[in-house]
UniProtKB/Swiss-Prot annotation:
PANTHER family on file: COTS-RELATED PROTEIN, SPORE COAT PROTEIN I
Membrane-traversing stretches: none
Alphabetized Gene3D superfamilies for the sequence: 3.90.1200.10, Phosphorylase Kinase, domain 1
Protein name: Uncharacterized protein YsxE
SUPFAM superfamilies on file: Protein kinase-like (PK-like) (SSF56112)
Superkingdom, natural source: Bacteria
InterPro entries referenced in this protein's UniProt entry, alphabetically: CotS-like, Kinase-like_dom_sf, Spore_coat_YsxE
Gene Ontology cellular-component terms listed: endospore-forming forespore
Name of encoding gene: ysxE
Length: 341
C-alpha cells in the first residue's frame, strides 16, 4: 500500500481507496476519478510505450493510454528496487456481450491495427530457402524422435502409463506434423517467387481480457507489454494456440472470427499457409515428450496429464485448420476456373 501511494504522488494523485485486482494490477479511486495502476512484470522491457506512440502516429488510437508522470515519464519507480509501475484510466473488461460478439469485435480491431501499421520488407530468396530448410529439417527430426521413442517403448516388457499414452497418440501426432509440413511446402512455393514480406505491429498478447470497454461500449486494447513488429499471423497464432488449450471443445465460430479478420485485412496466400503450418504443428506434444525423454521428470501422473492436455489441444486445433484449408482450396479452385473461363 505504501509503495502504491508513493507511485501515485508522482502523478499528483492521492488514493481514497485501493482495490487489488490481480498481483500486478490495482484499481485506484481518487478525487480525479478511477485509475488502473499496473506493475510491470519482472523481465519485461519498457519499450512497449514506444510502440504505442508509433501506432498512434499511424492513426490507430483504439488502445488504453498510458499516463505520464508529472516529470513527463511513462513509468514510475516504486520503493522496492527494480519495481516499475504505469498508470492508465480504468476501463471494464466485463462487457455483457455474447462470446461471439466480443471476439468478432476484437478480431475486427486487430485487423484495423494490422492494416494501419503494415509495411513491406525486402526478403532475399536465400533467406526464404534457409528458413524453409531449417524448419523442415527440425520437424522431420521430431518425427524421427517420436518414432524412435515408440520403437524403444514397444521393446520393453513393461510400458509405463506415460509410454502407453504416447504410443496411443503417435499416429495422430505424426499426421499433424505431416499436415504442417505440407502447408510449410505451400508457403515456400508461394514465398520464394516474391521478394517482399509483410510485417505489422502485433499486440503480442491478444485476448478478450486485454480488450476493455468504456461506458459507451467502445473497445480498446490494453497490455501492449509484448508488442512487437512481425508477420500479421503472429497475433492470430498466439490467440488461437491459447484458445484451444484445455479440455476438448468445439469452436465453429473460431473460423468465422478468422474470416472476419481477413475481411478487414486480407492475408496473402503465403501468410495463410504459414499460419496453418504453425497452428497444425503439435509443439505442445513434443515439449512434453522431450521433457520425459531428457530426464526432466515429474510425477508420472502429472506427466500423463500434461500429455493428455497437449493431445487435446492438437485435436481441438485439427478441425479449425482443416476447415480453413478447405475454404482456401475452394477459393483457389474457383479463382483458377474464373481465370480460364
Amino acid at each position: 500500500m505504501e509503495d502504491t501511494q508513493s507511485v501515485l504522488q508522482e502523478y499528483g494523485l492521492t488514493a481514497q481507496f485501493i482495490e487489488p485486482v490481480s498481483p500486478l494490477v490495482w484499481k485506484v479511486y481518487t478525487d480525479y476519478g478511477i485509475f488502473a495502476l499496473k506493475k510491470l512484470k519482472e523481465g519485461r522491457g519498457k519499450h512497449f510505450t514506444d510502440h504505442m506512440v508509433a501506432i498512434e502516429e499511424k492513426g490507430f488510437r483504439s488502445f488504453v493510454p498510458v499516463y505520464r508522470t508529472n516529470s513527463g515519464e511513462f513509468f514510475s519507480a516504486g520503493i522496492q528496487y527494480g519495481d516499475i509501475y504505469y498508470l492508465m484510466p480504468w476501463l471494464q473488461f466485463d462487457q455483457e456481450e455474447e462470446r461471439d460478439q466480443k471476439h468478432a469485435y476484437l478480431f475486427r480491431e486487430t485487423a484495423r491495427l494490422h492494416e494501419r501499421t503494415a509495411q513491406e520488407l525486402k526478403v532475399r530468396r536465400d533467406e526464404i530457402e534457409r528458413y524453409y530448410g531449417q524448419t523442415k529439417k527440425k520437424w522431420e527430426q521430431d518425427k524421427i524422435f517420436y518414432e524412435q521413442f515408440v520403437d524403444r517403448a514397444e521393446k520393453e516388457w513393461y510400458l509405463s502409463p506415460f509410454e502407453l499414452q504416447a504410443i496411443t497418440y503417435f499416429s495422430e501426432t505424426i499426421s499433424a506434423v505431416n499436415f504442417a509440413l505440407e502447408r510449410l511446402e505451400d508457403w515456400y512455393e508461394s514465398a520464394k517467387e516474391k521478394d517482399v514480406s509483410r510485417v505489422v505491429m502485433n499486440h503480442g498478447s491478444l485476448s478478450i481480457h486485454h480488450f476493455l470497454y468504456n461506458d459507451a461500449g467502445t473497445g480498446y486494447f490494453t497490455n501492449f507489454e509484448r508488442a512487437s513488429v512481425g508477420p500479421p499471423q503472429n497475433d492470430l497464432l498466439g490467440f488461437y494456440t491459447k484458445m484451444f488449450r484445455g479440455f476438448p471443445k468445439a469452436c465453429p465460430e473460431c473460423v468465422e472470427w478468422f474470416y472476419g479478420y481477413t475481411k478487414s485485412f486480407p492475408l496473402r496466400e503465403a501468410e495463410v499457409s504459414l499460419f496453418l503450418s504453425y497452428m497444425a504443428y503439435p509443439a505442445a506434444m513434443y515439449k512434453v515428450l522431450n521433457g520425459y525423454q531428457t530426464g526432466k521428470r515429474q510425477h508420472e501422473k502429472e506427466e500423463c496429464t500434461q500429455l493428455l492436455k497437449a493431445y487435446w489441444q492438437m485435436k481441438n486445433i485439427e478441425p479449425f485448420v482443416m476447415k480453413i484449408h478447405q475454404i482456401e482450396q475452394e477459393k483457389k479452385f474457383q479463382a483458377e476456373n474464373e481465370s480460364t473461363s
